[in-house]
Amino acid sequence: MPKPEPRPLRTLPERAFHARARLVAALMCCVCFAGLAARLAYLQLFAGGWYTNRALGQQLRDTVVPADRGRIYSDDGVLLAANSSCWTLRASPREMPEEKLSLAAQGLAEILELDEAKLLEKFSDRTSNDCLLRYRVERDTADRVRDFCEENGITGIRINQDSKRGYPEGEFLASVLGFTNVDNAGVSGLELKYNDVLTGQNGVVLTAVNAWGYTLEQSYETEKVPLEGSGLRLTVDANIQHYLENALDYAVKEHHVAARAVGIVMDVNTGAVLAMSTTPAYDPNQPRVIYDAAARKAVDALTGSERAAALQLAQQTQWRNKAVSDLYEPGSVFKLITCAAALDAGAVSKNSTFYCGESISVAGTRFHCANHKRHGSQTVTQALENSCNQSFIQIGARLGKEAFCDYFAAFGLREPTGVDLPAEPKKSLYYTADRMGPVELASCAFGQSSKISYMEMAAAVCAVVNGGRLMQPYLVSDILNPDGSILQHTEPVCRRQVIKPETSETMREMMEAVVLYGGGRNARIQGYRVGGKSGTSQKLDSADEKARIASFVAVAPIDDPQFLCLVCLDEPHSWTTAGGSLSAPVCAEVLEQTLVYKGVPRAVEPETDPDPAQTAADLPADGDSFDGA
């Protein structure tokens, strides 16, 4: 047998080449192995959670169970806002029997008042596993759908429990409560201001599904129970609120008020708001329906984009709480502030005398009293009774612009009141001392040329009569746990001392004189001592030169102040625009009912003989007017 030929020896370069090849191969294997190891480590250590969640997402379907918002109660326990159960209907077309799609569309369209053709089109999309049928239906509708599906063997229809906000009292306190949107989030009023407090924690139901998205047996479900939000107990008393709303409703209709009316009732010693109304109101259960007949008629007369814009404006107008959000010229009611400031600063006493002739000239501008009335020589008390512009121009001049502006700020008229409602203006419109000349000081002294909020005016008058303390207005007395126990209580807050207690006492005497002898006689209440002040202010920024705001503020009992009522009728069209004639009777009606309801006993009335300087046939014509710029 022949011997095999010997293998030729490799040369040195060949051996080096093969060695390098083996080394490269080994390195490549190491790199690949390291890459796989790194990928595995990444998946195990870092991406595991993501893949787990993705797998669960394919295996589980989560359904949110909305939590109820907290309830809102009046101070006397009337339920004002609460959630009620409802049901949202959805369908999974891929789970519905194909041979029953037409039957399902026909039956559900009839029950839910939907278009049958559109419903059948939805059901025919076999790739869909979720489509909305009807949002938030009542129990009887949900029961009819359930019975129909069970009787006809129709699967794939889901009836999910839901929750919706409701207001059992309808229009009652609407501008204060506000309303919520379709997601149960606050849009306005207390619902918006306390949205985080009222909002609960949603629950969830996890349902297992198979690879095709079909729901498995209910034994695979797990549930996280929703938690109800915290509730609110208001300072508002439902009875006093009814007194105010009823009186305002009548006044608005009787005097043809064009730009809505405002009413506020407060506890003068704590700042608690006992009632607040902007009239006409709206129903927060249907907030997008225009309830003012004139506004609705104006909107309906338009078409297209003009109608849409007008509708939006009308809705925003009716939602706005005028008592808090609007600024206005306070008119002669503001004379209480000028008078209190001048007395407190020592610029005048209640017996200081001033002369009122046909008119008074200030830096070339002539001012006169309403109807060009001449009051002659009178004390400060009589000037307040007569609502005399000329006298208050002189009082303002004695006080001086620096002191006037200081007291204006001290009474809280240059800053928000801090009331717990949204949309309060950040500042009012006013003159600072460096921009105030003699004419501006003159007009500001009797209540024109400045614009403040109704809430600011009410809080300031509370300070005038309660001993001089400026209290922060508030509407929520308690935040409640879902079981009704108190989670947080609101204590009254005194912002500062504005005037001396003795000044406040003098002002109470003078305000009572206004009701007994002056332009506030229509605010008198048998058996109760009342103090007040009227106002009839020009709307200087209105295109209508005759536009007026008729207002009156009253406090009772004036010898032991407890309740304040401010009523303002914006643009009344009646036999007069005088606040002492139109608004004072509203205040009297509301306060009398409130005093009786609160158990304040009637007392023997003091003598009410006419003031020596005033006779019944010579009542002051309340109003504010001037000539010139």
Describe each model-derived feature in a short phrase.
Residues P2-R7, A81, N210-T222, N269-V333, ...:
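Beta-lactam-recognizing serine transpeptidase/beta-lactamase-like catalytic domain environment
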Residues M1-L302, Q318, L327, E402-G412, ...:
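Periplasmic/cell-envelope proteins involved in peptidoglycan metabolism and beta-lactam response
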